[in-house]
Regions:
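Active-site-proximal beta-strand elements of phosphoester/diester hydrolases
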Residues: 1-8, 37-39, 92-98, 134-136
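A short acidic, helix-capping loop that chelates divalent metal ions and anchors anionic groups
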Residues: 10-12, 46-50, 105
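A short, polar/proline- and glycine-enriched secondary-structure boundary/capping micro-motif
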Residues: 13-15, 106, 142-148
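Short acidic, glycine-rich surface-loop motifs adjacent to enzyme active sites
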Residues: 31-47
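A short C-terminal boundary segment appended to hydrolase-like catalytic domains
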Residues: 121-152
């Protein structure tokens, strides 16, 4: 597993710095035979939420171009969108995990809270590089977000 820092201080969007990209490449070159799960906070592809996609990873094409040299990086995991996703991205699997707090409603133009319960994603990393995963959510109404909030 490699955890990349996509935070840009003081702004909501993400970007992988030159340092992070070089560090990732050094790590991947050191163990080319190992499967690697790549984790980062910001989503590298459009989520379908106009308001949220302006806060995505700003240099996803740079990341994708670098990863072509490393076929054993077959799964990426991100957060930030507070939604559950399991999609293909440049020939790899991209997972997004729900938030353990407030969920954002999918496919919205403006900020919208979803009434889906907080959740988390369980991962089982298999020796052949596959990732088995399941999303779990709180089963009761212990957590109810303020549906009228204009930001979280």
């Amino acid at each position: 597993m490699l955890l990349l820092d996509s935070q840009v201080f003081g702004v909501p969007h993400g970007e992988l710095s030159e340092y992070q990209l070089e560090w990732m490449e050094r790590c991947l070159e050191a163990y080319p035979e190992r499967y690697t799960l790549l984790l980062l906070h910001h989503h590298p592809l459009p989520s379908g939420c106009t308001w949220l996609d302006q806060h995505s990873l700003r240099n996803p094409h740079t990341l994708a171009a670098m990863l072509w040299r490393y076929p054993k990086v077959n799964t990426l995991l991100c957060g930030h969108i507070h939604q559950e996703l399991d999609l293909g991205w440049h020939g790899r699997r991209l997972l997004a995990t729900p938030s353990t707090c407030v969920q954002f409603k999918p496919h919205c133009t403006n900020f919208t809270i979803d009434d889906v319960s907080p959740g988390w994603r369980y991962l089982d990393l298999l020796p052949d590089g596959r990732v088995e995963t399941q999303v779990f959510r709180l089963e009761n109404d212990d957590f109810r977000p303020d549906m009228d909030s204009d930001g979280y």
